[in-house]
From Swiss-Prot:
Residues 492-516 are annotated as: Fatty acid-binding. It is an enzyme of class 6 (ligase). Coiled coil: none annotated. Pathway: Lipid metabolism; fatty acid metabolism. Keywords: ATP-binding, Endoplasmic reticulum, Fatty acid metabolism, Ligase, Lipid metabolism, Magnesium, Nucleotide-binding. One of its GO terms (cellular component) is endoplasmic reticulum. It catalyses: a long-chain fatty acid + ATP + CoA = a long-chain fatty acyl-CoA + AMP + diphosphate. Disulfide bonds: none annotated. This is Long chain acyl-CoA synthetase 1. Belongs to the ATP-dependent AMP-binding enzyme family. It is found in: Endoplasmic reticulum. Its cofactor is Mg(2+). One of its GO terms (biological process) is wax biosynthetic process.
Length: 660
């Protein structure tokens, strides 16, 4: 059997109350030790400035201008043009009073100004603190105060919220710089509390008038404090040094250069995940290292397809929900084909899959099938796509397989956390044995599993499984102002992720469960709620699902947002002709959903206490606006409980009455 990872240490049986730990695994490129770091690339500033020297005239940052509610073509700034603006913005920050080590917030949607502000921070050893553009005033208050932010770059539509009375943090700011313009009214409002405001143009002008030499960072300096959006509690400030960022990018370069179809300065990345999220941030850093181009979506995910068609990216990265929607769209189109064409599509799918499973690359498995059927799907992704990367949560094997067959490009899953700079593990392109897995350790990190006895996971057992622990050079330095939490997750030099993994015989890592959000039901059984949501979410009737249980109850309940298309087909089969919202109130639909969830539970061999016993049917998907999900669409469990407390209580009341 081909092995994809190197075992560099054997496992150790637990004694004296200590848990057992499994073998330590590394990337094959690191089997004899971590490769030496490129001495020219030791900071985030090096990544950018070296590419400016090598690729001054390459397109770096692209955006679409909206005029009279019409979205125009992509416009571009070259590496040289971006560099000139970075120098001006950096000089303006210094003129406004920023000193090395000052914290600078960036609050808004992805755009060129976001990156220019970030690089200006790097140029002067300032600490960049991203804020999700979806944050409410409470979270913004917390981060600005906790990180002690002095200056903030803000999307123009966010400035008003910053200056509202319930957003108390504004008073500590020295300056607010708009991505575009600031109205006279808001400038006056800010001046009343002693805060200066600048338009982007004014700030550039100030930098030109008062130029300052750059003051680049050392490798050990803090590059950024990234606050995790968090599914519960206050956000955590994850401290990342310049060395960690640079090491990750160099490691990514080494990893990608192994493959025949390499990334180059001609590649184009579509950025639509929040830049405040580690996955997008590090993808962009990697693209800047290559001298490649990054184009930003125009701010509306509902019409992302339009940006894809206009930009024609070669690389897309997203969370599973993004790829699930792509899959749903393709499936919908297939349903509309006549039976003959659908039969041909399915036959070509099986034919290409068979050759992929024999080890052929996606481009050589079946050029005929690609030409007849699948190139049309590739065209829907712009026609030039070469790599799809899914991260943030597990992508179902069925969807990953479907994308590998039909998108005519490499499709891989990755795994990581903000604390590990996102890319802790990454799959191999064209290796079908990696379906449903997250691949192998990154070049500069090590992975091992640790026993979780209460869940029955043993890293030294027949099927080695346990909590995923990470050690290496691409790691955070700790949680900002929170040494207790840092000590809690860092034990003996290993970061404990809270995720449960399994090491397959070929050395590949598979995510199988979640230690975090682990609850104990009243009968003493442990349940991993997020794991169940991932499983039940694979059913076509489910668009969104939140599973709830607690230690005072013996059964699980859920709030389900059904898939409108699936519901409408179900209704048509039964002769119902009501609108979707009305169908969701039908008791027949509720029973149908419970039946479907039971079928999914049986298919996945779940334990009986993991079955969903009651559901509340919701018509509206969980959204960021109501603070029910994070910016990457992960359920905010505490907020969901507050929002649906009445429905939860009612479901348990009815379940109790049935038992009497």
């Amino acid at each position: 059997m081909k092995s994809f990872a190197a075992k560099v240490e054997e496992g150790v049986k637990g004694i004296d109350g200590k848990p057992s730990v499994g073998p330590v695994y590394r990337n094959l490129l690191s089997e004899k030790g971590f490769p030496p770091i490129d001495s020219e690339i030791t900071t985030a500033w090096d990544i950018f400035s070296k590419s400016v020297e090598k690729f001054p005239d390459n397109n770096m940052l692209g955006w679409r201008r909206i005029v009279d509610e019409k979205v125009g073509p992509y416009m571009w700034k070259t590496y040289k043009e971006v560099y000139e603006e970075v120098l001006q913005i950096g000089s303006a920050l210094r003129a406004a009073g920023a000193e090395p080590g000052s914290r600078v917030g960036i609050y808004g949607v992805n755009c060129p100004q976001w990156i220019i502000a970030m690089e200006a921070c790097a140029a002067h050893t300032l600490i960049c603190v991203p804020l999700y553009d979806t944050l409410g005033s409470g979270a913004v208050d917390y981060i600005v105060e906790h990180a002690e932010i002095d200056f903030v770059f803000v999307q123009d539509t966010k400035i008003k919220g910053l200056l509202e009375p319930d957003c108390k943090c504004a008073k500590r700011l020295k300056a607010i710089v708009s991505f575009t313009n600031v109205s006279d009214e808001l400038s006056h409002k800010a001046s009343e509390i002693g805060v200066k405001t600048y338009s982007w143009i004014d700030f550039l002008h100030m930098g030109r008038e008062k130029p300052e030499d750059t003051n680049p960072p050392k490798a050990f300096n803090i590059c950024t404090i990234m606050y995790t959006s968090g599914t519960s509690g206050d956000p955590k400030g994850v401290v990342l040094t310049h060395q960690a960022v640079a090491t990750f990018v160099v490691g990514m370069d080494l990893y990608m250069d192994q493959f025949e179809d390499k990334m180059t300065h001609d590649d184009v990345y579509l950025s639509f995940l929040p830049l405040a999220h580690i996955l997008d941030r590090m993808n962009e850093e990697y693209f800047f290292r290559k001298g490649a181009s990054v184009g930003y979506y125009h701010g509306n995910l509902n019409v992302l397809r339009d940006d894809i068609q206009e930009l024609k990216p070669t690389y897309l990265a997203g969370v599973p929900r993004v790829f699930e929607r792509i899959h749903e769209g393709i499936q919908k189109a297939l349903q509309e084909l006549n039976p003959r064409r659908r039969f041909i599509f399915n036959a070509l799918y099986k034919h290409k899959l068979a050759w992929l499973n024999r080890g052929y690359s996606h481009s050589k498995a079946s050029p005929m099938a690609d030409f007849i059927a699948f190139r049309k799907i590739r065209d829907k992704l712009g026609g030039r796509i070469r790599l799809l990367v899914s991260g943030g949560a597990p992508l179902s094997p069925e969807i990953e397989e479907f994308l590998r067959v039909t998108c005519c490009c490499f499709v891989v899953q990755g795994y990581g956390l903000t604390e590990t700079l996102g890319g802790t593990a990454l799959g191999f392109p064209d290796e079908m044995c990696m379906l449903g897995t997250v691949g192998i350790p990154a070049v500069y990190n090590e992975i091992r599993l640790e026993e979780v006895s209460e869940m029955g996971y043993d890293p030294l057992g027949e099927n080695p499984a346990g909590e995923i622990c990470i050690r290496g050079q691409c790691m955070f330095s700790g949680y900002y102002k929170n040494p207790e939490l840092t000590e809690e997750v860092m034990k003996d030099g290993w970061f404990h992720t809270g995720d449960i993994g399994e090491i397959l015989p070929n050395g590949v890592l598979k995510i199988i469960d979640r230690k975090k959000n682990l609850i104990k039901l009243s009968q003493g059984e442990y349940v991993a709620l997020e794991h169940l949501e991932n499983i039940f979410g694979q059913n076509s009737v489910v668009q969104d699902i939140w599973v709830y249980g607690d230690s005072f109850k013996s059964m699980l309940v859920a709030v389900v947002v059904p898939n409108p298309e699936t519901v409408n087909r179900w209704a048509k089969d039964l002769g119902f002709t009501k609108p979707f919202e009305e169908l969701c109130s039908f008791p027949e639909l509720k029973e149908h959903i419970i039946s479907e969830l039971k079928s999914t539970a049986e298919k996945n061999k779940l334990r009986k206490f993991e079955y969903i016993k009651a559901v509340t049917v919701e018509t509206k998907p969980f959204d960021v606006e109501r603070d029910l999900v994070t910016a990457t669409l992960k359920n905010r469990r505490n907020n969901l409980l507050k929002y649906y407390q009445v429905q939860i209580d009612e479901m348990y009341r009815k379940l109790a009455s049935k038992k009497i």
